[in-house]
Amino acid sequence: MRCSAVSLGSGTIINAIATGFGSAFGVDLKIKADVELLDNGKKIINGISIDNPTLKPSLVERCVKNVLDYFEVDYSAKISTSGDIPVKSGLSSSSAASNAAVLATIGALGEKVDSDLVLDLAIKSSFEEKLTVTGAYDDATASYFGGITVCNNMERKILKKDEFKEDIKVVVLMPEFQKNVDVKRMKLIKDYVDMAFEKCMAGDYYKALFLNGLLYSSALNFPSNISVDALEAGAITAGLSGTGPSYVALCYNENEKNVENALKKYGNTVITKPCINGARILY
């Protein structure tokens, strides 16, 4: 009983921590999970990251366990993950890994794939591993479905699905800044994040992303000038992704190199693009 599945990374439009409402978009970087189930009644689960064997596999092991518990089977399992989403890139590698792990385990069992169940078990696993504050339903759905999702994270509801109408690139900056998840400070900017979210609901995703980035970078003591540097180099919009320290900048193809050059003085960069084709079982 084997199965492989992939799920996307995602970038932030609105971080949901301040208000409970968030938005994210799928990017063309993926994590693949390969699951093999063993019907031996021992319930031993072993995981490994092929790209980074020193990375603890506790999240994907938890995902497999939760799926097996849900379907009330006592199989053992082996799970390996690989992909091109950099760890700590701000591109929701944990959402991608958990979605892919759950999907591959359900596939290996031969059970019918139900999107709500996949997302619920993936988010449950992230909560149990203390990897999320809000459940990251926006990140999880953008990773799973692709495109743009606008969500009520508290109620786990998708309020709106959309996609970018233009052919654009995503330049990701991964600086060596110390991560800061000060929830109290993020709650202080709630009213202003609400204003950015209104832009998002109206379909003005570029402005929403930029405003969100300014607000959260200020609250978390990350430099806001980086986003302006990206604009100066020709980006359409730019802002902090998630709780940082990474930033995302969206630009037209002809400005890709200028934007990358403006950002890479702050750290490593990755260039990708939005993706509307979400998670799927490969075989």
Swiss-Prot record:
GO molecular function terms listed in the Swiss-Prot or TrEMBL record: ATP binding; shikimate kinase activity
Biological classification of the source: Archaea, Methanobacteriati, Methanobacteriota, Methanomada group, Methanococci
Single biological process term from Gene Ontology: aromatic amino acid family biosynthetic process
One Pfam family of this chain: GHMP_kinases_C
Reactions catalysed: shikimate + ATP = 3-phosphoshikimate + ADP + H(+)
Protein family: Belongs to the GHMP kinase family. Archaeal shikimate kinase subfamily.
Listed pathway(s): Metabolic intermediate biosynthesis; chorismate biosynthesis; chorismate from D-erythrose 4-phosphate and phosphoenolpyruvate: step 5/7
Keywords of this entry: Amino-acid biosynthesis, Aromatic amino acid biosynthesis, ATP-binding, Cytoplasm, Kinase, Nucleotide-binding, Transferase
Keyword Transferase in record: yes
Organism: Methanococcus maripaludis (strain C7 / ATCC BAA-1331)
EC number(s) recorded for this UniProt protein: 2.7.1.71
Protein name (Swiss-Prot/TrEMBL): Shikimate kinase
Binding-site residues for ATP, renumbered to this chain: P86, V87, K88, S89, G90, L91, S92, S93, S94, S95, A96
Location of the protein in the cell: Cytoplasm
Keyword Amino-acid biosynthesis: yes
GO cellular-component term (any): cytoplasm
